[in-house]
């Protein structure tokens, strides 16, 4: 399906069941999902989605991921209150990566930072470039 879409004109559509069936889920039934703030373009985080998480996200408009460590659905913000509302969902050209354009409430990272990408790496090493907005102990009511 995705090879055919390379030559498709804008406005070309495919039904959701056909798209979901054509997605190249990995051996664990997952696809990488990148969350991006819809209005600024800031990359917030990368997580995983299985089919159930993707369908729930599309159905409800509230982002749901799949937690590999817990082996269960992870509804973003369920314990922290820092929810992601789906604005738009895109697929890359191969259909093997999801881009979720979201409206993020508060920090996206479990460390209390706005983005999980707060470590800059260059030829000299790693530098932390962002401070937490919220103490993680407060964020998760520990």
Swiss-Prot record:
Q: Which family does it belong to?
A: Belongs to the PRA-CH family.
Q: Extract one GO cellular component term from the record.
A: cytoplasm
Cofactor field: Mg(2+); Zn(2+)
User: What is said about its interaction partners and assembly?
Assistant: Homodimer.
The processes (GO biological process) annotated in the record are: L-histidine biosynthetic process
Q: Where in the cell is it found?
A: Cytoplasm
**What InterPro entries does UniProt report for this protein, alphabetically?**
PRA-CH (IPR026660), PRib_AMP_CycHydrolase_dom (IPR002496), PRib_AMP_CycHydrolase_sf (IPR038019)
**SUPFAM superfamilies, A to Z:** HisI-like
Underlying gene? hisI
Q: Which key words tag this protein in UniProt?
A: Amino-acid biosynthesis, Cytoplasm, Histidine biosynthesis, Hydrolase, Magnesium, Metal-binding, Zinc
Which residues does the record give as Zn(2+) binding sites?
93, 109, 116
Q: What class of enzyme is it?
A: hydrolase
Instruction: List GO molecular-function terms, semicolon-separated.
Output: magnesium ion binding; phosphoribosyl-AMP cyclohydrolase activity; zinc ion binding
List the NCBIfam families hit by this protein, alphabetically: PRK00051.1
Name of protein: Phosphoribosyl-AMP cyclohydrolase
Identify the pathway: Amino-acid biosynthesis; L-histidine biosynthesis; L-histidine from 5-phospho-alpha-D-ribose 1-diphosphate: step 3/9
**What does the record say about how the cofactor binds?**
Binds 1 Mg(2+) ion per subunit.
Protein role: Catalyzes the hydrolysis of the adenine ring of phosphoribosyl-AMP.
Q: Where does Mg(2+) bind?
A: 92, 94, 96
According to its UniProt record, the EC number is 3.5.4.19
